[in-house]
Amino acid sequence: MLKLGLDIGSTTIKCVVLDEENKIIYSTYERHYSQITEKIAEILATVRSKVKGVENAAVALSGSAGMGVAESSNIDFVQEVYATRVATNTFIPGTDVVIELGGEDAKILFLTNGLEVRMNGTCAGGTGAFIDQMATLLNVPLEDLDELAKQYEKTYTIASRCGVFAKTDIQPLLNQGARKSDIAESIFNAVVSQTVAGLAQGREIEGQVVYLGGPLTFMSELRNCFDRTLNTKGICPENSHYFVACGAALCAEKTINFDKVIEEVKNYRGSGNFAFNPPLFKDEEDYKKFSDRHAKATVLQKELKGYKGKAYVGMDAGSTTVKGVVLNDDGELLYSKYLPSKGNPVEIIKGFLEEVYAINPEINIVSSAVTGYGEEIIKNAFDVDYGIVETIAHFTAAKYFMPDVEFIIDIGGQDIKCFKIHNGAIDNIFLNEACSSGCGSFLQTFANALGYEIADFAKLGLFAKRPVDLGSRCTVFMNSSVKQAQKDGATIEDISAGLSLSVVKNALYKVIRASSPDELGKRVVVQGGTFLNDAVLRAFEQEMGVEVVRPNIAGLMGAYGAALYSKNKSKGNGKSKLANKETLKNFVHDIKVTNCGMCSNNCRLTINSFGGGRRFIAGNRCERPITKKSQSNELNMYAQKLKMLEEYKPVEGLRGKLGMPMALNMFEMYPFWYRFFTELKFEVFHSPFSTRKIYQRGQQTIPSDTICFPAKLVHGHIQTLIDEGAETIFYPCMSYNFDEHLGDNHYNCPVVAYYPEVINNNMKDVQKICFIKEYFGVHMPKHFPQKAYEALSKYFPDLTLNEVRKAAKLAYDEQDKYRKKVIAKGNEIIEKAEKEGKKIMVLAGRPYHVDPEINHGIDKLISSFNVAIVSEDVVSPRVEKFHTNVLNQWTYHSRLYAAAKYVTTRKDMELIQLVSFGCGVDAITTDEVREILEKEGKIYTQIKIDEITNLGAVKIRIRSLLAAIDND
């Protein structure tokens, strides 16, 4: 008897027919674009016409989207993990591990010693959909991505946990001129990293490994990346992408009536029970009134051809699009262009300028300016007169339409920028931290996944009867909500309108975090390409309860603001140095990638050369590769702290070597433990400061992908110590920190306090050495010697209590000395900055944020703006304990609140809070720090840090803060 198996996945349907010997005699693999039932009916009809005898075949369904159809049509359903296991055991007996990547799901099946399954939960980072998105971003056909990756020379660090994070990494690389082949390989490495760290969760992948699923079938370089990371040679069987369908077929027992089932599948409809919102528009008349009102905010257009007056050029090299405008003296639009950047903004801007000169060869350009992610490369490539930070460009443009504007919201491709305006100056800035679920690319991705162009998809939602209530969630969560709504009978129109509403809710309640729309004021200008979507605009007005102004050039506002800025700066006089026709004719753009090597950062540099001696270097964390001079760290407390820690050199000891991981609280506690164990005659040393290589060394033993990056790094530090021959590693559990009398208690956060237990339970290699993870309480100096003696004498029986007492006294003295040294150095930086009239930035985080691999050189970047940097623990002692709105029981948090309080007393001081993505308790600290600062009229700036290394977005945030302060 023939057997037919269908695997109905999140993006594709696979169908196989097996003969009596379990050989595939027919197979098909097709995308369904969410039209699942129609595609199943079509495939079944095709199979019936092409395969003889299939009418009597046993049929079974599997896959994430197949259960509802199976139930309604009375067809056998086989859970996909079980189907995979059956197929693997049948076709490749002896398999130990199966790694399967699908459209939106990723799985690892451990088949040895019973079945254990690891699946991605809510995030589709590192799956086929993620690779699809990345190929689109690179403007490369998906089928070419694999060949492109094979030509790589260097790789970059790219986050794969989320497609949005990865875009945040890739877009600046493209804007800085990185080679696409290098980025393609980096994308594959990110997928491997996500699968190994996120799914294996500390269990080793060993033995015979089998690769399944579309991405691993069609992309040999992706398989090579897995092989290299796992140090194995995995098997990718022929027809590997059909394995779930084969498993379903192998389990099939019941025959079906094809005609009846095809009819039932075609007629399958959901329940119609889904949460929905009121319609966006009652009728066509309602929509016409809305359109007429918004048509009033219009920039007049004039002809560029034959124009004889003064002209001003503005350009905006954004995250996914490039905009260019030419204005006359009255701010009227002579010419404009809005194009996708296609990963090469330089080429697009060159084309824009060539068109301008072709239309009007005699044009008199007085001044020019550029803004956006690609600002620096464009400024250098084409000799643009001014570079302007995005926030100021958008504010300048908004004032043109509404001089007394109170609030500006700009929703672009990947970012949301909002500014609160008070007394004609930017009073507060909100930017989306890490997620772009409320942005244009979010809608674009959905439209494309459903088989529509974005413009057509947007129009569908205008007159939807029941816009689906999708909440304000991340792209991937939203995928499952959309699929569920479709199963429940929601139309494409309902989904389009629902997504527009969710974009708005995400912007208002997740980015701006407004408790009510009233907080934003009544004089609102909206801009950014996303607001050209009438459904989004209407949803925004409905949610806000106010009528807003949307200029007809909403998508060009960055470029328009840049042009106005250049006009104001030049005062309408002079001649722009912008590249002319001749320069463009001889324009060249060469790219070279190299490592800097001028300091321990060893930054990967992309050197863009444009001929005529013009060049732009990207990827540097300091000015050294450009100026050839060493950056002074004199006014950088982060650099000074690292220098202080480097002073603790190992001293030979009779009791042998003792290693400590330079991670988490060790950045603050090392002086204490160093002195303590040195006095006990150990040769004390620590692992090197973190690098990407150190992270990768411990990657396979990380048990959870949701833990913060600083904690993930601990695994690499322990592995490094073991690899370097450490026979004893000291990494203690510490529930309490020293009491600084700033809070209600003085705990360490749970991760800092108990991570040694995680290491002990997840790293096999620590069992082979002496790993000391006992609980120590440094907060009780009286009891410490006795407790320390009891804990350590188990490992070192020759220790005496007297020795421990002496060592403990000196350790407390050393810690006190180190603490005073930090505060003295910080005070010195503050005094020097005051004398020189420099701004002082409190870069507030945790002790481990001084680690260069964790902060990615943010301290050096801030220093490059001629700003002095101190850490939170320098200024926190200047404040007495005060009331907070949250339980103030963690030492590190108490310092943050005290530092924020102190900053509000100084005009020359600002605070930037560093937050590690995945830090649960920072959900509390960020709100409290924000409240303390904003209450006294200070701007709150937060920078989320993680594996992401590209500082493009960070730079915009810092410049925005500095520009807002200058404007004040």
Q: Where in the sequence are the language-model features?
A:
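Glycine-rich phosphate-binding loop plus the immediately following alpha-helix
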Residues: Q35-I36, N113-K154, C162, S240-V244, ...
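Glycine-rich phosphate-binding loops at beta-strand->alpha-helix junctions
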Residues: A65, A200-T229, S240-H241, T371-G374, ...
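Conserved phosphate-binding/catalytic loops in two-lobed NTP-binding clefts
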Residues: F77-V81, D227-C246, D385-T391, E541-Y560, ...
